[in-house]
Amino acid sequence: MNEQYSALRSNVSMLGKVLGETIKDALGENILDRVETIRKLSKSSRAGNEANRQELLTTLQNLSNDELLPVARAFSQFLNLANTAEQYHSISPQGEAASNPEVIARTLRKLKDQPNLDEATIKNAVESLSLELVLTAHPTEITRRTLIHKMGEVNACLKQLDNKEIADYERNQLMRRLRQLIAQSWHTDEIRKNRPSPVDEAKWGFAVVENSLWEGVPNYLRELNEQLEEHLGYKLPVDFVPVRFTSWMGGDRDGNPNVTADVTRHVLLLSRWKATDLFLKDIQVLISELSMVDATPELLALVGEEGASEPYRYLMKSLRSRLMATQAWLEARLKGEKLPKPAGLLTQNEQLWEPLYACYQSLQACGMGIIANGELLDTLRRVKCFGVPLVRIDIRQESTRHTEALGELTRYLGIGDYESWSEADKQAFLIRELNSKRPLLPRQWEPSDDTREVLETCQVIAEAPLGSIAAYVISMAKTPSDVLAVHLLLKEAGISFAMPVAPLFETLDDLNNADAVMTQLLNIDWYRGFIQGKQMVMIGYSDSAKDAGVMAASWAQYQAQDALIKTCEKAGIELTLFHGRGGSIGRGGAPAHAALLSQPPGSLKGGLRVTEQGEMIRFKYGLPEVTISSLSLYTGAILEANLLPPPEPKNSWRHIMDELSVISCDLYRGYVRENKDFVPYFRSATPEQELGKLPLGSRPAKRRPTGGVESLRAIPWIFAWTQNRLMLPAWLGAGTALQKVVEDGKQSELEAMCRDWPFFSTRLGMLEMVFSKADLWLAEYYDQRLVKKALWPLGEELRNLLAEDIKVVLAIANDSHLMADLPWIAESIQLRNVYTDPLNVLQAELLHRSRLAEEQGKDPDPRVEQALMVTIAGVAAGMRNTG
């Protein structure tokens, strides 16, 4: 066991040593000694030494304002380096995931061993694989892009240092490079000065494509193909690419007034520009490689006499010219110039595919398969995965914005107020207009700014090249009219094809009602005819957990999916469930494999569509090798879930879940909504108010500027509780409900559910993960430094609940300690705690100083404010998630 981690630990300590040298060079021996003392005290405090724990608190409380920032930065940067070492370890020869392509091999072996599955069935399941990853900017990646880039280089150095064969002088050069990179990071401000704009966020997404996915996706497909050949004797067709990427950056306007129609238009152009740029580099390589002369008569006919001497190069050069002309036109459009479209402007993937595929077929036919299956095949696969748009965009808007727009229109037309109509009247009006051949919008109408924005967004969708917009997502969808309203607005903008419109059900009531809403829609003749047998529905994880607590929310999500699957199956509709999961447990995050196998049977038949959020994008797709690993995990899980679906839960299990759901939701809401002390306690015990100052994402933290917990977005709500280590949204109510069911004599039933039902065992596993990141003494310390004494009893009550919850979960799982079955994660959390603890203590101290200055009417000390921001970023790195 320790053998496996010794490589990780030695890398972590080596990087820590280099960081120490950097700090000493920059700030002198005294600061380094101070940091080292704090680290040793923290380590000893973690090992249970109470005297050292007290000394740690005293030392951090007594830091001068000048010492605050260097100490905070030292621990924060160390955690970034530890995360980098861990990410490298996951793909290194010593790491557990060295075998990640092995995941696919393991899955294929497991499937072949099933007596009821033949190879043809497995092959069909492979051919219907579909994985769409939707990159979102929230909760925002807290680490700056420039530092991410440096950490990527540190990773590359670790990889080369792992090679035992390298000469001493090369090793010395690599160590010098590591020192340079760590010094560069130390002398770079880790906190952004300004909030990123939606366009900046989109560029961050494009950088992930360029630096990692562009190389990672073809390599993943190569790996998948090799495993399929070996285990099934089956080769992937050239045009088969089961993975696609979509983005919300620049398209998600829900609660973000900064994402306008103009911004979306700009991001669509920028995305196409980036695609031409990346394909030009590919084509340049192909021009240099494809110098061959032999070609089929078909290819020679295509190039004519002029290209006969080097037919492949000739075709590639003409494709290069088209790419360059397209890029120049896009560049002019981005600068605001109106130019006529050039002949041969690339707007569809086929225009890229055809010349490349013609070369591929000719090379294969002329016995040059080895060449065809090199760079050329990679480029063909990139055309299928990324294509002309690079990433497609989802548009997301809140349902009330569409209702308000139609209300304004009907009032102008003098036919009443749509907003105040009953649901039946709204539906009758919408269906009548959807069936009508005449336009609804009067030319002379001057709508309000908000309504104009909604209409212009639909206009942008109508103008965009076919295939560049993936779906229109309606957040806070509650009724059939919410869906029909969007279809009508799109029709009025001139969109004639069946653009996927996905209602997002995200509160407990809406999830419970989702099946009824979709059943009503599918009973409408116009609707059934229009959607052509396909429906997408999005399931909201974060808002439902914030609304009802994690246990009730996860059961409502399961039941909603289960009912929708059955309804669509009966109606002959192909359903795609779109999962709006976050990286953190309170927002539905779970290790991919476990999460997918815990869904209802049949939930992945229409493929997997899932959001990949801000900081998780870097952990899962930050490097090409990590991308291969993540995509392989998803592939294995989807195949397994479709061919060996989890069992239907027994009725008695469903009853127990209903019971757990009611008890946990009552307890959760009893605190969060009904306890008058809760909101003041939350505001003072966590850095919730200070988080708003962090220039994180382009989106405001609240849907409405005033208001309590209910108006706070799910992300800052979870981020705040993660910072003070109480992790409350991810467990409150769950353990109490389990305890009650145990007291009712059902422990053996719970143990059976844990053993035989992936949904339930994943829930408990996620609770264990949260418990191992939560910390009772730190949460108590925040109370002592920041909370009025009158509110201390509430904090104590919550911590007692947490301690009880941990005992209950361990009893049901039959374990003596947390994460017993995932030692690798337990090890990783332990490793980071030594560095995260001082940041937490320091953060509480900084919050205390900052709030005291505010109470005394003094200006905040910039050193305190800056150090506070650094601790927030550092704790996020230590917890491996923001919100």
From Swiss-Prot:
Gene3D superfamilies assigned to the protein according to its UniProt record, in alphabetical order: Phosphoenolpyruvate/pyruvate domain
Reaction(s) catalysed by this chain's protein: oxaloacetate + phosphate = phosphoenolpyruvate + hydrogencarbonate
Chain coiled-coil ranges: none
Positions of the catalytic residues: 138, 546
Protein name: Phosphoenolpyruvate carboxylase
Cofactors (names): Mg(2+)
Alphabetized PANTHER family for the sequence: PHOSPHOENOLPYRUVATE CARBOXYLASE
Organism: Citrobacter koseri (strain ATCC BAA-895 / CDC 4225-83 / SGSC4696)
Pfam assignment, any one: PEPcase
Function: Forms oxaloacetate, a four-carbon dicarboxylic acid source for the tricarboxylic acid cycle.
Keywords on record: Carbon dioxide fixation, Lyase, Magnesium
